[in-house]
Amino acid sequence: MSATYPRFALVACVFLVLASTVAGRADDLTPRPTMGEILRLDAEADEILAKDATIEVLASGLDWSEGPVWIPGDARQPDGGGYVIFSDVPQNRVHRWKEGTGLSVFLTPSGYTGLPGYSKEAGSNGLALDRQGRIVFCEHGDRRVSVLTPGGGKRTLADNYQGRRFNSPNDCTIDAAGAIYFTDPPYGLPEGPQDKKFRELDWCGVYRIAPDGGVTLLTREMTFPNGIALAPDGRTLYVAQSDPAAAIWKAFPIQDDGTLGAGRVIADATAMVGRHRGLPDGLEVDVAGRLWATGPGGVHVMRPDGKLLARIDTRMACGNCCFGGDDGSWLYICSDAFLVRIQTKTRGWR
C-alpha cells in the first residue's frame, strides 16, 4: 500500500541497473541517526528486543518505500548477495541497501513498463525470494506476479483470474513447496479503489499460484487485503486488511489442498486509525511464530493469537518489514520516505 490511498508468457522488458547512491551512507564509521521510539507493552518484549535497541535510519529521500526482502550471501546470487532490496512504488524502481556501500538503484522499471502517467503507484510493491533464490515481484502497473530470470528479464507467473486481469498485486509470500500466496487490492490502478475504467474484478482477492502455474482464488471476503505472511509450520496464513473502517489482521488455516478455512480476526487496530499514521500493511513472522506487522503507529509485535507485546513507532507510516542480516536478527522497516532497521533478539523463520 502507499501513503497516497487508504492507502507463463515471456515478457520482453528492458531494465536499467544503476550504481548511483540515493541519500544513503556508504560508510559505517559514525553512529547512524535514529528516529521514533519502542513501546514495550508486555514483559515478553524484553526477550525479543534489547533494552538499548534503537531505530537506525539507513536511507532517506525515498517516495514510498515498500516490500523489503533480504538477499542472502550465497552462490546463487550473481553479485554475492548480502543486502536488502525494497520497492519505491511511485518511482517504479527497486533499491538495494548494503552494509558499507549504502543505497543504490537495483532495478528500474520495477513494476510498470508502459507509457508514463498510467498511475501514481505503478511500480513493484511486495518482493519475495523463491526456492531457487530468484526474486518474485508483485507489480502494480503491469498487474501481475513475475519472477526475475537469470538473464535479467522477467517472466509472468500470473496476471489474471479466469481471464480477468488482476487489480494490482500488492504483497506475496511463498511456501515450502513453492506455491505463492498474494493479495490483490486496487491501489495501483489509475484511480485506486475508485477506478472504474481499468478495473476488471469486482473484488479484492487473496490468491494462490500453484507450482504448476494454476491460480486459485482463496478468499474475497476482505475489503482491502494487503500484507501477507505464513506461519513457520506453513499451516496458517496471515493477511492484513488496510481498511480504515476495519483495520484488522486475520489468520486463515491452510487446508491440505492449499485452500483456506474460515478466517478469524486476531487483532484490530481500527481505534488507532487517525490518531496514528498508517494502516495494517506488510508483515513478517519470526521463528517463534510472532507477527511483526506494520500498522497504525508503526510495527506491531504480536503473538500468534494477536496479543500485543511491543510497538516500534517510527512516527511515520510503515509499509512493510523483513528480517535480514548475516544471522537474520535485524528487522528492516520501510517507513514512508525512510529505510530503517532495529536489532532484535530473534530472527525470521525462513
Label each region the model flagged.
Residues 1-5:
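N-terminal secretory signal peptides that target proteins for export/translocation
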Residues 9-20:
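Bacterial N-terminal signal peptides
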Residues 24-350:
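Sequence-structural signature of mature extracellular/luminal beta-sheet repeat domains
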